[in-house]
Amino acid sequence: MIHIDIESDIEYKDVSLNLIVDHINGEAKYTKQWCKDNKGDFPVYSANNNEPISYINHYDYDGEYLTYSKNGCAGYISIINSKFSINGDRCVMSINSDYKDRIDILYLKYYLEPIFRSNKKGRLGDLGKNEFTKLNSTMIKKLNIQVPIPITSDGTYDLEKQKEIANKYKQIDEIKQGLIEKIKSLVEIKVVPSGE
C-alpha cells in the first residue's frame, strides 16, 4: 500500500517487516562460564543494551546489524557495527539482500523500537526499575508490522529521505538523553542548611 503524509508531502510504501529482515536468535551456549573459558577480544551481547557481558575468542557477526533484547527490558533496539556475538537473551535482525542498500538501519530502529516496546509481555518495574519483560522473534513476526518506507516519484525507496527522518529522531533522542542527565545531576544535589 502507498500513502502520502499530507503535512510533509512524503510518499510512503508500506512493506512487511517480515520481508525486510530475518530474525536470528542468539546462542544459548554463550553463558558467563563459557565466555570465561573462551576469553578473547570479541564482544558478546546479552539483554543489556549498553555493555557486552564478556569478550570471547571468535565472533558470529561482522558488520552493522540491528539487535534487540528479548528478556529483561525487552524490545530495546541497538545497532552494533563490529565483530560480535549475541547470547540467547538477544536477537539479530539481518536485513535481507533485496533491501540491504535500500533501507536505512537507523530509520528502521527508530520506527520499530516503540512498536517493540509496546508489545513486550511481562512484569513492568516501578519507576523504570526491576522490569522483566519478554519479546521474542515469534511474537514480532505475528504482529505483521508494516514499515512505511519513503519513496521517490518513480516509486523507488528514498534512502536519503529515510536518513533525513532518522537523523531528526536521533537529534530528539540526544536532547532527551541530555535532559535525563541534567535531571539526574539535579536530583543528586544536596542542600545543606547553613547554621543560623
What residue spans do the PLM features occupy?
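Non-catalytic DNA-recognition/assembly elements of restriction-modification systems
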Residues: 1-49, 152-196
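Intrinsically disordered, low-complexity boundary segments flanking structured domains
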Residues: 7, 28-34, 52-57, 77-81, ...
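A short glycine-rich beta-alpha junction/loop motif
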Residues: 84-91, 124-153, 159-160
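Long, highly charged amphipathic alpha-helices
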Residues: 107-111, 141, 164, 168
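Short leucine-rich amphipathic alpha-helical surface patches
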Residues: 112-119, 147, 169-176
